[in-house]
Amino acid sequence: MKKNIALKVLVCFLIILSFLGIINAQTPKLFLADFNKVAGVKKSAVTNKDIQKQIALLQKNADQILDKQIVSVVEKQFATPCGNKHEYMSLASYYWPDPSKPDGLPYIRKDGQRNPDNDKITDHKGFDDLIKYVTTLSWAYYFTNDEKYAAKGVSLLRFWCIDTATYMLPNLNHAQIIMGTDTGRGIGIIDVHMIPNMLDGISILESSASMSKADAKAIHQWFDQFLAWLQTSVNGKQEFATKNNHKTYYETLVASIALFCGKQDVAKQVFTNAKTLMASQFEPDGKLPLELERTNAFSYTSFCLKAWSMLSTMAEKVNLDLWHFQTNDGRSIQKGFEYIMPYALAEKKWEYQQIGPINLKELSQALLFTKGKLVIPEYNNNASKFS
């Protein structure tokens, strides 16, 4: 619990940084943060005690990572369907043994109820830890200029993407397997939906003494191969064809990796197509009907809005404005936030199914991206409730 709270504070802090103070500085290739504004915060930290406290918290979190290691994909105790230990593997989150079958196969779906046995396969946790650790370490390096944070971040990236004994092949062929039914699904791509956060971190680390040109080249090659897999594989095409939040996060992944790999034409096409996606996902009143079908409808609505916030933020990097795009019948990201805010503030009772508790974490992160982009009075007047 303490780790999750600290991570939430870190994420909020880093997003807030991207909306404050501007100075002239060489801008690295960042996709979710505005480096010039972040550099302004670093400069202000010399005299601003509040910023100093936030940086101290960031540094504390980074210090806790220095002695940690992530679990390699080769360390899992289960054989992958293809037999290659370097392949990523995970089980479908909401699938459970069928109690009516002697062997429990095939597994059956219980939407919104996560099977804890899935944690026995550690690849998802390993990748998730990689993203969290590299993101934290890279920003600690930037704000403190302490090379030890960069060195640790680069070592983790080598461990996951480069070292022949421990690397992961750049694909998700066997993600979110349904036991007794398949060997992996496109829907499993959602496992790595927070990669865009780490790409900002990698770009920061590229300026460090710890990352060699060979390291940077190999890491970029890994992501270039992963991007090709996302666009051409059976699983990638399946996820591309989805309609709900999976589609939005798929496009966010493709766009961020394309920008990271210098393929702006690919990213621009994603952002252009997002206008059609917006028309298909949102209703004119702001509802996201495909998310409202879920057993945790509030959570999935918030989750999808976060994807839209990330996608819109990245679109700015190529001078495209999704924040203010509106279809002829009024569908827009703005309407999406306006719809959910009264429920988030408990001004209205949630009208759809929500079997889990209402948690504002995802919505809070989505709203932070909207600062300076959208005018949401309910948020501006109640910001403390989302901190």
Predicted regions and their residues:
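Long, repeat-rich segments with strong aromatic
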Residues: 249-351
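Bacterial Sec-dependent N-terminal signal peptides
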Residues: 1-26
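Extracellular glycan-targeting catalytic surfaces
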Residues: 25-239, 248, 272, 316-317, ...
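Noncatalytic carbohydrate-binding groove/subsite architecture in carbohydrate-active enzymes
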Residues: 232-238, 242, 257, 261-266
